[in-house]
């Protein structure tokens, strides 16, 4: 199954180039050129990952895309793609799981995307197992309170 990526950038040349590169590496790539376009696609589709430029309509437009992605029930992996990395490391605190700095070579880009997708899926599975375990414990409260001698 191809992994679906939403790629968001207001520079159409960058968008089309990255789309072609990622499709050559067997990703199903959808594109958006603005925050509002990205939000619409996030609400109507389902993506494994969202990669967004940080600076589009505003200097913080990318963060709006990340927040919209993180609000989705399907919880896609999120990455900021920028030529202007933030001076501090608060990009993770703001919801992005990866920071991709332009220019970036094709090999490095694909490697970082693959690694992020693997880590993200592992985290989602771990969280799902934790929820299942908590639900099981809630179903059997008397066993949880038993003392072991």
Predicted regions and their residues:
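Alpha4 helix (beta4-alpha4-beta5 surface) of REC/receiver domains from two-component response regulators
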Residues: 64, 71, 83-101, 107, ...
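Two-component/phosphorelay signaling modules centered on CheY-like receiver
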Residues: 12-30
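Short amphipathic alpha-helix used as the core "switch/output" element in two-component signaling
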Residues: 40, 60-75
